[in-house]
């Protein structure tokens, strides 16, 4: 049994490392609502929004929403300075998943959004992220997870460990499953999901690991 499990994992590693599926750049440009759940993130939200503003994607097709989750600092002010629209979430919420549900419910009847892009407030986004994600959506995928990396990989053993974990998840799990035509799993941030999926199936996670829970759904 152990040999079979090892062979199974080895096959995944080989496929993830040596093979890749190609897709054509999309001609059809979708409209994205970028959603950022933020609670007291005034020190980092500007860096994320700056990277979003530098995306290689038509700016008129992007709307950035910072959901200020019961903030007691200047997160909303910093977000507005960077051009984002601020949504004040004053309801009693305890998880990021609940904040996302609150936001998706607000936009249920909004026909100006084709898909959501989800980020954490301390992220920095590569300049071609949305262009690549649009290629995936235009190829027929309803959900797409981006590559996740660590900004401060050399700070200490913990950040280095996270970098290894993210690389393992992206290359040896998600990339392999994608190359085999199978479903991958969401990794909490840096993913895109078509609005029609949320509208049809809902988004009501019950745990703090909303990404894993929604993947299973």
Locations of regions flagged by a protein language model:
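N-terminal membrane-anchoring/stem segments of glycan-assembly enzymes
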Residues: 1-28, 79, 174
